[in-house]
């Protein structure tokens, strides 16, 4: 039976998380909806959020587009460096590395994150 788009995305996300579950690297986890984009840096054990940024904040309230994703990427990089996190694994949650996800990743790299 063919998987739906959502099931296929969740399957890709699960595969990544299973591979990196035992690692000692923190994850930069990205989630996007039609109107917003969210980014979190999660501890290696997966139980604690170390830093977060999204388009729900007052500064980035209007927009879920590529420009807003770039701003979220810069914001998450700034928040990560404030808690002394530099090296992360990029968890795109099964989304294609294209458009808003790519813009967020590029901005986070420019901000000082290494992945």
Swiss-Prot record:
Asked if Ribosomal protein is a keyword of the record, the answer is yes
Cited SUPFAM superfamilies:
Translational machinery components
InterPro entries hit by this protein: Ribosomal_uL18_bac-type, Ribosomal_uL18_bac/euk
Keyword terms: Ribonucleoprotein, Ribosomal protein, RNA-binding, rRNA-binding
What is a single molecular function from GO for this protein? Answer: 5S rRNA binding
Has keyword Cell division? Answer: no
Q: What does this protein do?
A: This is one of the proteins that bind and probably mediate the attachment of the 5S RNA into the large ribosomal subunit, where it forms part of the central protuberance.
The record's HAMAP family line, in alphabetical order, gives:
Ribosomal_uL18_B
Family in the record: Belongs to the universal ribosomal protein uL18 family.
Q: What is this protein called?
A: Large ribosomal subunit protein uL18
Taxonomy-wise, where does this protein's organism fall, top ranks first?
Answer: Bacteria, Pseudomonadati, Pseudomonadota, Gammaproteobacteria, Candidatus Pseudothioglobaceae
């Amino acid at each position: 039976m063919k998987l739906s788009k959502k099931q296929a995305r969740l399957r890709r996300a699960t595969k990544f998380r299973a591979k990196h579950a035992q690692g000692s690297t923190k994850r930069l986890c990205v989630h996007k909806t039609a109107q917003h984009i969210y980014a979190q840096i999660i501890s290696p054990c997966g139980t604690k959020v170390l830093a977060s940024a999204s388009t729900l904040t007052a500064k980035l309230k209007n927009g879920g587009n590529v420009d807003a994703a770039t701003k979220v990427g810069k914001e998450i990089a700034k928040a990560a460096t404030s808690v002394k996190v530099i090296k992360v694994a990029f968890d795109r949650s099964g989304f294609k590395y294209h458009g808003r996800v790519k813009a967020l990743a590029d901005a986070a790299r420019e901000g000082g994150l290494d992945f």
